[in-house]
């Protein structure tokens, strides 16, 4: 969790798109499976942890902190995850020499196997074992509330840069893959063949619009092209494959 927490913090405080991509590429290069794939799934919001909801965090912190103090702190900080991470009182106080922080895979595996009744005790125990940045990352992970300026598209571009492949190849595979994406990383590192997507009706990357200038008509044969107006608004792709129908936007 500490490595994942450092990644989130660096992404949050890195304003440039290229800087964020470099951080992600470095993470993919230096962090082993399954940690890097789980971090990717969390950032792209493809990791669903059903046993923990924001209301649970309020209940947990209410057992540790005066209600009025928490209300005032939340009003001042403005973010639930950050407030809980900062105000959470660790029994015996914070210790810099602690070495029992859970790994990202430990947290994910335990929560996916836990019932709604078991989830709170797990989260409470981890909050006690982590520092403030680790608690923040844990809370964001379990609630899915990442706001770090990284879109799924940017994460896929980082994968493409990491493996030196076109981003369109990542997008075509994406909906047929599942976390922690070990076959994807093996291919990108040149250690395995390209994964075969088992998903029916997959997404196909949309070609960007290309304007036609007046001088182009004299050298282009209109019969070779299909053209349409470029409408403003969101794009939607309808895909049909062996009876499976999907809409992508």
Language model features: what each stretch is:
Residues 1-249:
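N-terminal nucleic-acid-engaging modules of covalent nucleotidyltransferase systems
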């Amino acid at each position: 969790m500490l490595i994942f927490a450092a990644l989130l913090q660096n992404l949050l405080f890195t304003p440039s798109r290229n800087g964020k991509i470099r951080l992600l590429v470095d993470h993919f290069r230096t962090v082993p499976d399954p940690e890097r794939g789980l971090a990717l799934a969390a950032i792209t919001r493809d990791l669903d942890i059903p046993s923990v909801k924001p209301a649970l965090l309020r209940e947990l912190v209410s057992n540790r902190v005066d209600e009025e103090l928490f209300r005032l702190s939340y009003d001042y900080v403005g973010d639930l995850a950050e407030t809980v991470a900062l105000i959470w009182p660790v029994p015996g106080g914070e210790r810099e020499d602690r070495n029992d922080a859970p790994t990202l895979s430990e947290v994910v595996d335990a929560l996916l196997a836990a019932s709604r009744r078991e989830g709170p005790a797990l989260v409470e125990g981890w909050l006690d074992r982590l520092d403030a940045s680790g608690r923040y990352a844990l809370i964001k992970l379990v609630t899915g509330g990442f706001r770090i300026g990284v879109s799924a598209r940017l994460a896929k571009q980082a994968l493409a840069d990491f493996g030196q492949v076109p981003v369109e190849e990542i997008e075509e595979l994406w909906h047929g893959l599942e976390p922690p994406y070990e076959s994807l990383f093996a291919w990108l590192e040149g250690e395995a063949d390209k994964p075969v997507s088992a998903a029916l009706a997959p997404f196909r990357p949309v070609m960007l619009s290309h304007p036609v200038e007046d001088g182009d008509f004299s050298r282009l044969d209109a019969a070779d092209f299909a053209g349409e107006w470029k409408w403003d608004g969101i794009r939607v792709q309808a895909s049909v494959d062996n009876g499976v129908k999907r809409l992508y936007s």
